[in-house]
UniProtKB/Swiss-Prot annotation:
HAMAP family named in the record: Asp_tRNA_synth_type1 (MF_00044)
Record's function text: Aspartyl-tRNA synthetase with relaxed tRNA specificity since it is able to aspartylate not only its cognate tRNA(Asp) but also tRNA(Asn). Reaction proceeds in two steps: L-aspartate is first activated by ATP to form Asp-AMP and then transferred to the acceptor end of tRNA(Asp/Asn).
Ranges annotated as spanning the membrane: none
PROSITE patterns, sorted: AA_TRNA_LIGASE_II (PS50862)
Binding site for L-aspartate: 175, 221, 450, 491
Protein name: Aspartate--tRNA(Asp/Asn) ligase
Record keyword Membrane present: no
GO biological process, one term: aspartyl-tRNA aminoacylation
GO molecular function terms listed in the Swiss-Prot or TrEMBL record: aspartate-tRNA ligase activity; aspartate-tRNA(Asn) ligase activity; ATP binding; nucleic acid binding
């Protein structure tokens, strides 16, 4: 018989009744029923009920057992007494009648319980992550994560992609965030960088003649904490293809992502034939470039109905041609209480308020806006929006470039408050035609709006003849349920176009050569047209596990202050380590 176990704690069935077996695992729950001890023994595979009665020679030791002690138990498998079966457990028809116990690893008093799923302070959970990972929900999430990555790999290989690993120690490059720098001992004063993404390497692979590449790539960004991103590192399904246009990337990747979602959606519908939504349309209709299409609400421009109207606040705004008025329909939201609640919410978001119109019986408009613009204009708004009796609409006015984010938040808030969002499906879409450039208000200059290596629509001619802020790029995202889960583009593979694109963003040719020398050099020796994308593994897993917290699908994450409470990172380096690296700390004054 095996030293520790003949079966796992999830393996025993009726067919094992009468067998003498050994199990090893953790004491999940211990109960004393009239002097008989019941121990739920747990391992990775499941739970088996073990029974120790006072006549057993193991009873004295069993009385000393506590939660999360690791033990080996030996005994006979028997059927549970009639009426005590547990249909929720695969082992729920049987129990182990224990004859012998060996303690393999006692446990100290627990800082957080493993049995049950009660909430606990996050810092405690992260400090004792090894205990937290024993809890069923988190344990299953991590197993689901592994299965999702397996599904990604299988589907990518079915599409003809090859998996390669790119370097982790590389050169620093401006890709939108700070790099994590690694000092070189061999080259004093010089630094490697951990890759923010394998962007240059995957493009170099295409120039090296490899046709289709992918990897599950670790990425590192030294960013300030954000609610929707783990500090430090994340993983992405990284993809690149040669001799492709945008539609070729879509045709290759849409079935991969759809298939992964269908594998793990637990029966929830997944969008087939994803819509293609231009970036500008997404902002206008949904107030975001990652719309939640489960929310049926679409915003509309209703400026004409307020131009020259009796509502002077909007009328005066519309004298400036760049200003607009957008309407957010609210089906079934035509109560004063709801409209006042939305108005208070808007004020809490730092806005002066949220104008509204309610439609009463007979289609008559009500509220301050309706009173100011009159019944004819109110009826025209109702006709445009398709609102009915008992509905409402909310209005946001000003420069759309400044209010679209708030309008999008208001659309989401209305959808949530009125229970319009279908929580039981995954709504996927391509967002296309991103602007190549944007105006950076902080630096007072034109900058890249997305990926600097993307091909501008119109190529070099567009870069030399058009206003940069009007140029669109062959860039695209995948949106799902209000999250951006992937981003990509067709690459700028011509050196003269690459130099011009960076020049517009304020980089001289020599700086481009210095920063991207390897790729710039490769462009001189025959670069194929190529493109690709990167899908966020963590966010996809988060969505499919039904959580909104990325720490619930990650093994050993940092906290929001970018600290690893389990391992004690970051930590101070020793004087010897610093001396070897020729580094002297220059700490800020406290």
């Amino acid at each position: 018989m095996h030293r520790y176990r003949t079966h796992t704690c999830g393996a025993l069935r009726d067919s094992n009744i009468g067998e003498t077996v050994r199990l090893s695992g953790w004491c999940h729950r211990i109960r004393d029923h009239g002097g008989v001890l019941f121990v739920d023994l747990r391992d990775h595979y499941g739970i088996t009920q073990c029974v120790v009665d006072p006549d057993s020679k193991a009873f004295g030791l069993a009385e000393k057992l506590r939660s999360e002690w690791v033990v080996r138990m030996e005994g006979k498998v028997r059927h549970r007494p009639e009426g005590t079966e547990n249909p929720e457990l695969p082992t729920g028809q049987v129990e182990l009648y224990v004859a012998d116990i060996e303690v393999l690893g006692p446990a100290a008093e627990l800082p957080l319980p493993v049995f049950g799923e009660q909430d606990y302070p996050e810092d405690i959970r992260l400090k004792y992550r090894f205990l937290d990972l024993r809890r069923d929900r988190l344990h299953q999430n991590i197993m689901t994560r592994g299965a999702i990555i397996d599904s990604m790999r299988r589907r990518m290989k079915e599409q003809g992609f090859f998996e390669f690993q790119t370097p982790i120690l590389t050169a620093s490059s401006p890709e939108g965030a700070r790099d994590f720098l690694v000092p070189s001992r061999i080259h004093p004063g010089k630094f490697y960088a951990l890759p923010q993404a394998p962007q240059q390497y995957k493009q170099l692979l295409m120039m090296s003649g490899f046709d289709r590449y992918f990897q599950i790539a670790p990425c590192f960004r030294d960013e300030d904490p954000r609610a929707d991103r783990l500090p430090g590192e994340f993983y992405q399904l990284d993809v690149e293809m040669s001799f492709v246009e945008q539609e070729d990337v879509f045709a290759a990747m849409e079935p991969v992502i759809t298939g992964v979602f269908e594998d793990f959606a637990k029966g929830k519908p997944v969008t087939k034939g994803w819509p293609r939504i231009p970036f500008a349309e997404a902002l206008r209709k949904y107030g975001t470039d990652k719309p939640d299409l489960r929310n049926p609400l679409e915003m509309q421009d209703v400026s004409e109905h307020f131009r020259g109207s009796g509502f002077k606040v909007f009328a005066r705004m519309l004298e400036d041609p760049k200003n607009q008025v957008w309407a957010i329909p609210a089906p079934g939201g035509g109560s004063r209480a709801f409209c006042d609640r939305m108005n208070s919410w808007a004020q809490g978001e730092g806005q002066p308020g949220l104008g509204y119109i309610m439609w009463r019986e007979g289609g008559e408009g009500a509220g301050p806006l309706a009173n100011n613009i009159g019944p004819e204009r109110t009826a025209a708004i109702r006709s445009q929006l398709g609102t009915k009796e008992g509905d409402a609409a909310f209005f946001v006015a000003g420069d759309p470039d400044k209010f679209w984010k708030f309008a999008g938040l208001a659309r989401t808030k209305v959808g949530e408050e009125l229970n319009l969002i279908d929580k039981d499906r995954f709504a996927l879409a391509w967002i296309v035609d991103f602007p190549m450039y944007e105006y950076n208000e902080d630096d007072k200059k034109v900058d890249f709006s997305h990926n600097p290596f993307s091909m501008p629509q119109g190529g070099l001619e567009a870069l030399t003849t058009k206003d940069p802020l009007t140029i669109k790029a062959f860039q695209y995202d995948i949106a799902c349920n209000g999250y951006e889960i992937a981003s990509g583009g067709i690459r700028n593979h011509k050196p003269e176009a690459m130099v011009k694109a960076f020049e517009i963003a304020g980089y001289g040719e020599q700086e481009v050569v210095d920063r991207f020398g390897g790729m710039y050099r490769a462009f001189q020796y025959g670069a194929p047209p190529h493109g690709g994308m990167a899908a966020g593994v963590d966010r996809i897993v988060m969505l499919l596990c039904g959580t909104t917290n990325l720490r619930e699908i990650s093994l050993f994450p940092m906290n929001q202050q970018a600290m690893d409470l389990l391992m004690g990172a970051p930590s101070e380096a020793t004087t010897k380590q610093l001396r070897e690296l020729h580094i002297k700390p220059n700490l800020p004054n406290k």
